[in-house]
């Protein structure tokens, strides 16, 4: 059973089509990144999944239930971290969690939830009016985890967190997915989406323009991977473009930059270069999710690269 499934999901506001014919599937235990520029239709789609808004056409199913016809069957099985939320300044974090546990009629320990999101027990007994943005974000996430939901819907979960907190958030999300929870989240920090997600969907102008793994998006856009080989001497007689799967070669000082339409040819290129000159360093690069996002939302071909771990060369 899919955690989320939409068919021809459409929402109109008068003459404006905010979401058009969206067909989306998120599987159980999957971490799915939901991306798009402002005004692309992400929030409207999420609101229809949560039955905060009714579709003009099409259907949305959440955990096997129709989101509009069976919302009560869904509510206690999902956890939500909304983009905008209000906390009660005069209540402590522990009191917030006790309220959330009662509201869901769940069997949960506030102290365990507090530990799970990286808050201290001392902080849990402070009034949240003095909390930082990052601490408030952790508290709302802890509330979302009440009852061990089958689906987490997270809007900008890393907002307000420092790098350490972002890493902890990523580990927490992965841990929930390992337990079988589906995680559906939107974020503007594309590097975090790339690091955490199994698949991504990209919305643009109300349409779902892409739904794939990050590597699958690279293949579909034709975003070539590259090797940068630093050499002791650039051999003028070396011909790498004759290798099928090599799409281009350029020279930058003492480095060869080789682009590939078929990344499987990298080893063959390294072997040929190594036979002609001394290789001092190798880096492998590929288009980042940010560049792929630009390619789908602006119609630009991804050109920049994001380093992978260095390759190893044997003489």
Where in the sequence are the language-model features?
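ABC transporter nucleotide-binding domains
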Residues: 2-6, 11-185, 190-204, 210
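C-terminal coupling/interaction segments
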Residues: 261-315
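Signal for well-folded cores of large energy- and translation-related assemblies
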Residues: 79, 140, 174, 194, ...
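Short, surface-exposed acidic/glycine-rich loop or hinge patches that mediate macromolecular interfaces
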Residues: 65-68, 208, 232-234, 261-264, ...
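ABC transporter nucleotide-binding domain
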Residues: 171-260
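Non-catalytic surface loops within mature trypsin-like serine protease
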Residues: 28, 121, 231-233, 262, ...
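Non-catalytic alpha-helical coupling and interface elements of nucleotide-dependent molecular machines
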Residues: 102-106, 198, 222, 278, ...
């Amino acid at each position: 059973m899919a955690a989320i499934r939409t068919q021809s999901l459409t929402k109109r506001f008068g003459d404006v089509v905010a979401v058009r014919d969206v067909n989306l599937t998120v599987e159980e235990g999957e971490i799915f990144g939901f991306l798009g520029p402002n005004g692309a239709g992400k929030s409207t789609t999420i609101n229809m999944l949560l039955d905060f808004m009714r579709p003009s056409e099409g259907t949305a199913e959440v955990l096997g239930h129709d989101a509009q016809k069976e919302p009560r069957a869904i509510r206690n099985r999902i956890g939500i971290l909304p983009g905008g939320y209000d906390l009660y300044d005069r209540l402590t974090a522990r009191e917030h969690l006790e309220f959330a546990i009662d509201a869901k009629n769940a069997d949960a320990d506030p102290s365990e939830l507090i530990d799970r999101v990286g808050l201290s027990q001392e902080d849990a007994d402070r009034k949240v009016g003095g909390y930082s943005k990052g601490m408030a974000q952790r508290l709302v996430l802890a509330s979302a985890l009440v009852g061990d939901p089958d689906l987490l819907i997270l809007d900008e979960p890393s907002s307000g967190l420092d790098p350490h907190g972002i890493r902890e958030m990523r580990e927490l999300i992965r841990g929930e997915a390992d337990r079988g929870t589906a995680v559906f989240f939107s974020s503007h920090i594309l590097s975090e989406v790339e690091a955490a997600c199994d698949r991504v969907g990209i919305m643009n102008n109300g349409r779902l323009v892409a739904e794939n793994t990050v590597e699958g998006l690279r293949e579909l856009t034709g975003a070539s991977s590259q090797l940068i080989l630093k050499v002791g001497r650039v051999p003028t007689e070396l011909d790498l473009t004759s290798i099928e799967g090599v799409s281009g070669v350029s020279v930058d000082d003492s480095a060869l930059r080789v682009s590939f339409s078929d990344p499987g040819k990298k080893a063959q290129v390294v072997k040929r270069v190594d036979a002609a000159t001394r290789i001092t360093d190798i880096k492998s690069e590929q288009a980042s999710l940010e560049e792929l996002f630009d390619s789908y939302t602006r119609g630009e071909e991804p050109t920049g690269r994001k380093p992978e771990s260095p390759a190893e060369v044997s003489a």
